[in-house]
Design a protein with these regions (language model features):
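Helix-turn-helix
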Residues: 24, 28-66, 70
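Hydrophobic alpha-helical bundle segments that form small-molecule/ligand-binding pockets
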Residues: 128-183, 226-230
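Short, basic, alpha-helical segments at the C-terminal edge of helix-turn-helix-like DNA-binding modules
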Residues: 74-78
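Amphipathic C-terminal alpha-helical segment
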Residues: 155-170, 188-209, 224-232
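Hydrophobic alpha-helical connector segments
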Residues: 81-127, 143-146, 150-153
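N-terminal intrinsically disordered/low-complexity leader segments
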Residues: 1-20, 195-205, 234-238
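Amphipathic alpha-helical segments used for helix-helix packing
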Residues: 70-72, 101-121, 131, 162-169, ...
Length: 238
């Protein structure tokens, strides 16, 4: 159905001996960015993490900009769509969206990275965009409209992951029940005559949120607009 090209997920690329690969450098940089923020990713810090001299990294990335581009390229390398499968454009587009969401869930630094570099200088981003435009023109949109839709989908994925329900990022797991309790009490204490729906929302904080249900629902929501416009004839809105 959908080609997912394996990358070094979950920081699985290891540096052994003299074999310092481009993928290993990008993967370790991603680990730093995900755990400490993009500002923590410097050539000097990365070299220390990898146990090499800064000069060793210049073999793969000449400067910090190239390193950031390499990180984006590495993260998006699995975003592909195969037109030869014979599946509908709707299913193939959903696979693209779900894959992008999955990458962003695994690498929370990706949205910041995407806004920090010229994405069109990376092979994987251009390939993913080209594949998506092909799907959207197949759906009936013009190339220009397809680009608008693709931008909407990318920003929608960023918003979905950034707004996922639950406790604040980085909160220790043993503190999560208390955080949810306090949030529930806060909402329950709002004036019911003025904010009845907010008070009702409080009940949703009794248990851990169902993340898989949340992401499936949001993917449906995101794609429903595209499918609806395609069915109505996207190009008629020019």
């Amino acid at each position: 159905m959908y080609l997912v090209h394996e990358t070094c997920t979950l920081y699985g690329c290891q540096v052994t001996g003299d074999r310092l690969t481009k993928a290993a450098v990008a993967e370790r940089a991603l680990r730093l960015a995900d755990e400490e923020g993009l500002e923590a990713v410097t050539v000097r810090r990365l070299a220390k993490e990898l146990g090499v001299t800064p000069m060793a990294l210049y073999w793969h990335f000449k400067n910090k900009d190239e390193l950031f581009l390499g990180m984006v390229d590495h993260m998006l390398s699995g975003v592909r769509s195969d037109p030869r499968t014979g599946e509908s454009w709707q299913k193939r587009l959903r696979a693209v969206v779900e894959t992008v969401i999955g990458v962003m869930r695994a690498h929370p630094s990706l949205p910041t990275l995407l806004h920090s570099v010229d994405k069109t200088r990376t092979e994987s981003f251009n390939r993913a965009t080209n594949d998506t435009l092909a799907l959207l023109t197949e759906a009936g949109f013009t190339v220009e409209e397809g680009f608008w839709v693709a931008s909407y989908l990318l920003n929608g994925c960023i918003g979905i992951v950034g707004a996922q329900p639950g406790c604040p990022p980085g909160l220790p797991s043993d503190q999560e029940p208390e955080w949810r309790r306090q949030k529930r009490v806060q909402l329950e204490g709002m004036p019911a005559d003025r904010f009845p729906m907010m008070v009702e929302l409080a009940a949703s904080y009794r248990d851990e949120p169902d993340m898989e249900r949340y992401y499936a629902f949001c993917a449906d929501l995101l794609l429903a607009a595209v499918e609806s416009m395609a069915a109505a004839g996207g190009s008629q809105h020019r």
